[in-house]
């Protein structure tokens, strides 16, 4: 039987090869065994994002932030999920948080909009 770590590694390998749907299978199994592991939840969020399952991706990134509130990438990724769901103002708040945590990262800065 596969270890949680080997399931996680298999999921990441699928992601690297552009096989996001397959990645979700291994990563969901890993998550079932270790639901509090932020790295598993982040990889799963990325996989769901890549197959346009925005709500599922959002849920994973929210869990990552529950486990690790200062994870700048998770704030950015959550923003991307919200933006894909048409929630631009909410997304903007996440981009601002990500940018505040890691100033000068072009990906984060470029997504911030001025809604004033």
PLM features: residue spans?
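Structural signature of tandem alpha-helical TPR/SEL1-like repeats
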Residues: 17-29, 51-63, 85-97
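Alpha-helical segment of the N-proximal tetratricopeptide repeat
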Residues: 2-33
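TPR/TPR-like (Sel1-like) alpha-helical repeat modules
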Residues: 80-107, 113
């Amino acid at each position: 039987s596969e270890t949680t770590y080997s399931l996680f590694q298999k999921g990441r390998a699928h992601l690297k090869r552009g096989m996001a749907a397959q990645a979700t299978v291994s990563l969901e199994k890993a998550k079932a065994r270790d639901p509090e592991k932020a790295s598993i939840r982040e990889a799963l969020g990325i996989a769901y994002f890549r197959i346009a399952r925005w709500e599922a991706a959002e849920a994973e990134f929210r869990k990552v932030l529950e486990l690790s509130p200062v994870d700048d990438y998770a704030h950015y990724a959550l923003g991307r999920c919200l933006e894909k769901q048409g929630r631009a103002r909410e997304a903007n708040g996440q981009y601002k948080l990500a940018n505040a945590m890691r100033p000068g990262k072009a990906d984060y800065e470029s997504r911030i909009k001025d809604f004033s």
